[in-house]
């Protein structure tokens, strides 16, 4: 979750209509299907952002969001409160979040590194009680910024903020009122927060839910500073859109590796690793698993100005070692859909299968060889032809 001035916009409370899909057995291509004369460039399948905030568009505003590549210098501050003083050491808190750095490095193929620093391992006393900071769902940007400003001011005598790109603010366990973990994204149009001559642009303010979600909550919230939206639903059934596929959905899901679409948006995979079909025709693509570096990562069929279908190969390894299903993951992307309203919909290849313990129905969504997806609204189809340890081969077509 993020807070921003834009959160005051009116949000639709209607639940998105169910995505119509046909799941069939793949058939041999007909004689009328034609491969394009020359492969399309990936740019032809890149979608523009239309929400003015975190979304699935490729034109991420780098004045608002930080780049997702390179080293990110993260300052960790440990805070307690007059009404909730800490009685334990900060060591366990630092150790709890430390694995987030390795997870991000693996997820990004080494292209994004979190240098999580803890130069001051003492508790920093906040000026106000924990109950005064309004940590409820729907917290306003102004209220959230006050919390961050107070933490920065209290820590300023002890650390040099000019040495860091972003801040993690970690509360004592005694501060039950600091319940959840929103991300602070600065507003360039306001004076904001400055310390040591440096404008503080990004901060993750952890809450007590960090102990329930585990260290990956840091990777999820840091993803918002890169411009990624929430893939879980803000209303209704929380995980109906993507379930445990992608960390921006269910943080504790069994297959949290970022979607290949997100890796492309963030610059972790190159245009040469994207197979694009923007116009009519067919194309056969050999996909390598998104959990590994190298090879073609996503096959994209563009269906409109802001919409596309994406196919990618998933395997139970690395960050996805607990995946409930493997094969080809197919999903619809809409870059005009706001965060929390379902900008990504995963297509379930096995809707009638009962999931085992620890898995949700949509966690079994991966397509196997011989299965096919057709969208009745657009006529596009994706057939899974082959699969094996090295990846999957799909044939995608557009009338």
Where are these regions (language model features)?
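Secretory targeting and sorting signals
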Residues: 1-32
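Zn2+-dependent metallopeptidase catalytic core
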Residues: 33-210, 219, 371-373, 379-386
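Non-catalytic C-terminal accessory/binding modules of secreted extracellular proteins
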Residues: 35-37, 42, 47-49, 54-58, ...
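Short, solvent-exposed loop/turn segments at the edges of secondary structure
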Residues: 71, 241-243, 325
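Non-catalytic surface loops within mature trypsin-like serine protease
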Residues: 80-83, 173, 252, 315, ...
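N-terminal short leaders/motifs
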Residues: 100, 106-109, 113-114, 238-265, ...
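Extracellular hydrolytic enzyme modules, especially secreted metalloproteases
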Residues: 161, 166-168, 174-320
């Amino acid at each position: 979750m993020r807070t921003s001035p834009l959160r005051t916009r009116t949000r639709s409370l209607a639940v998105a209509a169910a995505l119509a899909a046909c799941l069939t057995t793949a058939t041999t291509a007909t004689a009328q299907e034609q491969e394009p004369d020359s492969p399309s460039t990936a740019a032809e399948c890149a979608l523009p952002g239309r929400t003015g905030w975190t979304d699935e568009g490729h034109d991420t505003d780098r004045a608002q969001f930080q780049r997702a590549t390179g080293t990110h210098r993260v300052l960790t501050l440990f805070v307690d409160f007059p009404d909730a003083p800490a009685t334990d050491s900060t060591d366990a808190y630092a150790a709890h979040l430390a694995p987030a750095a390795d997870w991000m490095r693996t997820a990004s193929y080494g292209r994004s590194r979190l240098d999580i620093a803890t130069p001051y391992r003492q508790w920093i006393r906040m000026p106000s009680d924990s109950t005064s900071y309004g940590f409820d769902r729907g917290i306003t940007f102004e209220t959230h910024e006050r919390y961050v400003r107070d933490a920065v001011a209290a820590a300023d005598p002890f650390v040099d903020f000019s040495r860091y790109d972003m801040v993690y603010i970690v509360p004592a366990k005694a501060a039950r009122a600091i319940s959840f973990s929103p991300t602070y994204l600065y507003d360039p149009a306001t004076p904001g927060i400055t310390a040591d001559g440096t404008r503080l642009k990004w901060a993750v303010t952890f809450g007590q839910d960090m102990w329930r979600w585990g260290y990956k909550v840091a990777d999820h919230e840091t993803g918002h500073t890169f411009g990624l939206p929430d893939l879980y639903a803000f209303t209704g059934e929380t995980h109906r859109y993507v379930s445990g596929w992608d960390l921006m959905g269910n943080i504790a899901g069994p297959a949290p590796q970022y979607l290949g679409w997100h890796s492309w948006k963030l610059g972790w995979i190159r245009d040469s690793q994207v197979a694009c079909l923007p116009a009519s025709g067919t194309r056969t693509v050999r996909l390598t698993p998104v959990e590994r570096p190298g090879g073609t990562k996503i096959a994209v069929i563009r269906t409109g100005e802001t919409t596309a279908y994406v196919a990618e190969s998933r395997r139970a390894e690395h960050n996805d070692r607990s995946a409930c299903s493997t094969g080809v993951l197919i999903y619809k992307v809409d870059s005009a859909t706001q965060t929390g309203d379902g900008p990504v919909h995963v297509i379930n290849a096995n809707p009638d299968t009962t999931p085992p313990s620890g898995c949700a129905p949509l966690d079994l969504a991966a397509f196997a060889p011989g299965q096919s997806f057709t969208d009745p609204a657009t006529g596009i189809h994706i057939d899974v032809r082959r699969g094996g340890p090295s990846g999957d081969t799909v044939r995608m077509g557009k009338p």
